[in-house]
Structure formats: structure tokens, C-alpha cells
């Protein structure tokens, strides 16, 4: 406890106190839209809802905020809000969108500065590659094969609005910004749906997504902070990846309150974290806690996490939100992949010398597959096929040129293959390629009022090459002169790319409208 109090005092000097004045700078809103604003000239900004906005409206919003008592009245009397101008729906929608995006940019600045000044990044080789989504899968392949039990955790909710405001107090003590945050939380009518369901983080109105995503990440980082801190204190190894989470100033006060509710709880639970083979992974409102310990230890972990959420965040967590399974008897949906460690082992045959004995070794395998149903459903929502997977034309693209249509379909196909290159079974991906290829042919045939057969004969190999993925090109070069290789075979080579930093909209069904 004394060690943490000293660390907490050290982190106070890194806090940023004045970020609110940045809301009066026009370039902040230009950054929010990733579009340049040139003085007073009207510049069209295409927001997420495809509506045109002018930089003149940004200037009007800044002038309104400069006027005395406008923001104070907006916070104290939200029903009589004149800042967002509810009398005009267009102004109200634009002001709420641009102000929330600008506020999200401003509150992210202290965290970004802390990450830039964090020395741990320089100590980790190829740190940029660790930002890839796929970088976690080689880690799982290497570590999960030796573990026994898996805990599926749904990060608890709901949480009170004031707790979210307090979470930002640890990052910044700019009081006006905190008041403005309260205004946004109580202003948006869809706030309750965000907290009530983790799926709705992808279904929010797009103009609010950045702000609410930042608040959600702040809440989750606070939830994980306690686990990371205890593991760092009990482990002999230094966790270089937890530095950005250890920026809190009143954690010692919470620990004192925690100790009053449970005397000696801190000392009794520290041994939970002494297992060097305990691994924690979080994704999309869910978390996985894998360990080599016994079933009794995992049950104690479950009880501890339930009590921790109840007394650390002051709300009740249902025990059913934490499921315990043996690793060999369970599978988990992770970033679009269905991952598991099958009971059947993989036979590996080794031979040290040419005429020596053959040594058969059986080892576990970390299996990653792709389910066809969610991806076909995504293509169906995007109007590339029916719900049963029957390809259809894309009428809204018939006004484009032939090469633009080919390029769009080919790019979607390559992106899906690129993201799911780690799948051990490629049959699902080839089914998606068939759907996209035939949908493209039907779109072109509809544009030229012809048949699919005629267009396929006219384009020939050019049409097929557009859907030729990078992975298949690599395999074709490897196996052209050695063995017969079929792209539609059952090869199970897994390739993980380190340039994927986000989930594609077609990959993640929740992002589709």
C-alpha cells in the first residue's frame, strides 16, 4: 500500500489541468472530421451521416460558447438549452455532433501525451507490430496450449453516470470539461441503451460513437487497473505493457475503503496472482482469463471478481456473467474467429538424420476457424446475397464504371481474406469469394442488360484475377514447381498479418446498419 501511495503521488505531476480552452479552437473540430477548415470560406464536411456542413456553423458554435452564461445555462437547465438551438433541427443535430466530437478529441489529448512519453514503448522491439489485431493470435497459439482452465467474463454493467465522470477526474482536473461531460451524458437520449447493452456501442448514432467509445475504454481500463496492479506486485517479471493503465491518484483511498469492507482482503487475494501462467485477454466487452491452476482456484477467482465489482464500482454483478470451462472442452469467439484447443492431438514426425529413426511426437494445436453464418449474414445486410447465401446484384453500384465495380468487389474480397488469413479451414472463405464473384458478375450484367454467362466469357481471366488474393499468389509461387496445389483444397496454413489495426465492417456484423 505504501508503495502504491508513493507511485500515486509521483503520477500527480503528469496530470493535465487545462484542456477546456481547446474547445474554442476551430482546428479541433477540423481534426474531429479529418477535414481541413480554411478560414471563413464555406467548406463542405461530410460527416458520418452523409450530411453537408459548413465551417461557418463551427464559427457560430464557438461564438455561442464565448458568450457569457451559455454553457452554464446549458448544464444547469438542459431543458432550456439555447447552445444547441433546439428550435432548428439541423442546427441542433450539427451542434450536438460537432461539439461531442470536439470534446472527445480534447479529452483524449492527455491520454495521448501520456502514451507518447511512456518509456516502455521504446523498450519493446517492433512495438508498432504489437498494435495489430492479429498480434494476439501467435501469443494465444504459444501460451494457451499449456493451460487447463478458461474463464469467460462479460465485463459488468450498468454503471452510474457520476462514476464515469469520476474516472476522467483521474486523468484531468479541468472542472469545466467535467461539467461539459455531465451535460453530454444527460443530454443524449440513447445513453441508457449504451450502458445497458454492450452491443449497442456499435449501434449508437454515429455522431456520438467516438465520445461514448472513449468513456467505455476509460471505464474498462479502470476495471482492469486493479488486476494489473496486483499482478505486477506479485510477479517477479516486470509488465511493460501495463504502464499506461497505472495513472491513478486516488486508488489508495479506494483500497482503504475496500479494506474496511473486507479486512485483510488485500493480503489474502495477492496470492491469486502469483501463478506465472495466468493470462488475461479482453475484446469487445468480454474478457478471457486462462490459467494452469486448479478448478478450486478458478472458483475462488470467480467469487473474487464478483465481490470486486460490487465494492469497487458500487454495483451488483451477476455470477452467471463468469463461466468456467476446461480449455480442451470449450471454444470461444474471439475477434471473428472461433478458437479452441481440440482434444485430438497433432502428430509431428521428426527425423534428425537421413537414415536415423523416426520420432513421432503428439502435441496440442490451437485451432482457429471461421463460422460461415455470421459472414453470410453480413454480406446479406450489405445486399450482396440473400439470407440463405444466394448471390444477388448490387443495384446502387450500376452507375459506376465497369472497372470501379470490379475494383470494389475485389477489394472487399481481398480484405476479408486478409483478415481471416489465420483460419485453419478455408472452405468458408471460398464460399464468400463465390458469393462476391457472382454478385459482381450479376451487377455488371444488370448494368449492361446482359446475362451473367455473356459477361463471364467476355472478361475471362481478367475477371478471375481481380478476386485473386495476396495469400493465394504466395502459395501459387511456392507450389507451382513442387507439388500440385489447389486453391480450393483443405490446406490449413495460418498466416497472421501485423498491419491490421481495426475490424472491417463486413468482418464485424455489429457495425452494419
Curated annotation (Swiss-Prot):
- InterPro entries on file: Domain_X, Maturase_MatK, Maturase_MatK_N
An example of a GO molecular function for this protein is: RNA binding
Q: Name one Pfam family in it.
A: MatK_N
The entry's localization annotation reads: Plastid, Chloroplast
* GO annotations of cellular component type: chloroplast
Going by the UniProt record, its keywords in alphabetical order are: Chloroplast, mRNA processing, Plastid, RNA-binding, tRNA processing
Q: Which GO terms describe its biological process?
A: mRNA processing; RNA splicing; tRNA processing
The record describes the protein's role as: Usually encoded in the trnK tRNA gene intron. Probably assists in splicing its own and other chloroplast group II introns.
**Family to which the UniProt record says this protein belongs:** Belongs to the intron maturase 2 family. MatK subfamily.
Q: What is this protein called?
A: Maturase K
Q: What is the lineage of its organism?
A: Eukaryota, Viridiplantae, Streptophyta, Embryophyta, Tracheophyta
Amino acid at each position: 500500500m505504501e508503495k502504491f501511495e508513493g507511485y500515486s503521488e509521483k503520477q500527480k505531476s503528469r496530470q493535465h489541468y487545462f484542456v477546456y480552452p481547446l474547445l474554442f479552437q476551430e482546428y479541433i473540430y477540423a481534426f474531429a472530421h479529418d477535414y481541413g477548415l480554411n478560414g471563413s470560406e464555406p467548406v463542405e464536411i461530410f460527416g458520418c451521416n452523409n450530411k453537408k456542413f459548413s465551417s461557418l456553423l463551427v464559427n457560430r458554435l464557438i461564438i455561442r460558447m464565448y458568450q457569457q452564461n451559455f454553457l452554464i445555462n446549458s448544464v444547469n437547465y438542459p431543458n432550456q438549452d439555447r447552445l444547441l438551438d433546439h428550435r432548428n433541427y439541423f442546427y441542433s443535430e450539427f451542434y450536438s455532433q460537432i461539439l461531442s466530437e470536439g470534446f472527445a478529441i480534447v479529452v483524449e489529448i492527455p491520454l495521448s501525451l501520456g502514451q507518447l512519453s511512456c518509456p516502455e514503448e521504446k523498450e519493446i522491439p517492433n512495438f508498432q507490430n504489437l498494435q495489430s489485431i492479429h498480434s494476439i493470435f501467435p501469443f494465444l497459439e504459444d501460451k494457451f496450449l499449456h493451460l487447463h482452465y478458461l474463464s469467460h467474463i462479460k465485463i459488468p454493467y450498468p454503471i452510474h453516470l457520476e462514476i464515469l465522470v469520476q474516472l476522467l477526474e483521474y486523468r484531468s482536473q479541468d472542472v469545466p470539461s467535467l461539467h461539459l461531460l455531465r451535460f453530454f451524458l444527460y443530454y443524449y437520449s440513447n445513453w441508457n441503451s449504451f450502458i445497458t447493452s454492450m452491443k449497442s456501442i456499435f449501434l449508437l448514432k454515429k455522431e456520438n460513437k467516438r465520445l461514448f467509445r472513449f468513456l467505455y475504454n476509460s471505464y474498462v481500463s479502470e476495471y482492469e487497473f486493479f488486476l494489473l496492479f496486483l499482478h505486477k506486485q506479485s510477479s517477479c517479471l516486470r509488465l511493460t505493457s501495463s504502464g499506461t493503465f497505472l495513472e491513478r491518484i486516488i486508488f489508495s483511498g479506494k483500497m482503504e475503503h475496500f479494506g474496511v469492507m473486507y479486512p485483510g482482503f488485500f493480503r489474502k487475494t495477492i496470492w491469486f496472482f502469483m501463478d506465472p501462467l495466468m493470462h488475461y485477454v479482453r475484446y469487445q466487452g468480454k474478457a478471457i482469463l486462462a490459467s494452469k491452476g486448479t478448478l478450486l482456484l478458478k472458483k475462488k477467482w470467480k467469487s473474487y471478481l464478483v465481490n470486486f465489482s460490487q465494492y469497487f464500482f458500487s454495483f451488483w454483478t451477476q455470477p452467471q456473467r463468469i463461466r468456467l470451462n476446461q480449455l480442451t472442452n470449450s471454444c470461444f469467439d474471439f475477434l471473428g474467429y472461433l478458437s479452441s484447443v481440440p482434444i485430438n492431438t497433432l502428430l509431428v514426425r521428426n527425423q534428425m538424420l537421413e537414415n536415423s529413426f523416426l520420432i513421432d511426437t503428439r502435441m496440442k494445436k490451437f485451432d482457429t476457424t471461421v463460422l460461415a453464418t455470421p459472414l453470410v449474414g453480413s454480406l446479406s445486410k450489405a445486399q450482396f446475397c440473400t439470407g440463405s447465401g444466394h448471390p444477388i446484384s448490387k443495384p446502387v453500384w450500376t452507375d459506376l464504371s465497369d472497372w470501379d465495380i470490379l475494383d470494389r468487389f475485389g477489394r472487399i474480397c481481398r480484405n476479408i481474406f486478409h483478415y481471416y488469413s489465420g483460419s485453419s479451414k478455408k472452405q468458408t472463405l471460398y464460399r464468400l469469394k463465390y458469393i462476391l464473384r457472382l454478385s459482381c458478375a450479376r451487377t455488371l450484367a444488370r448494368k449492361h442488360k446482359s446475362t451473367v454467362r455473356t459477361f463471364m466469357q467476355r472478361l475471362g481471366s481478367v475477371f478471375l484475377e481481380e478476386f485473386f488474393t495476396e495469400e493465394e499468389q504466395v502459395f501459387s509461387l511456392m507450389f507451382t514447381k513442387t507439388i500440385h496445389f489447389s486453391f480450393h483444397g483443405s490446406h490449413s496454413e495460418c498466416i497472421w498479418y501485423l498491419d491490421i489495426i481495426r475490424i472491417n465492417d463486413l468482418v464485424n456484423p455489429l457495425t452494419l446498419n
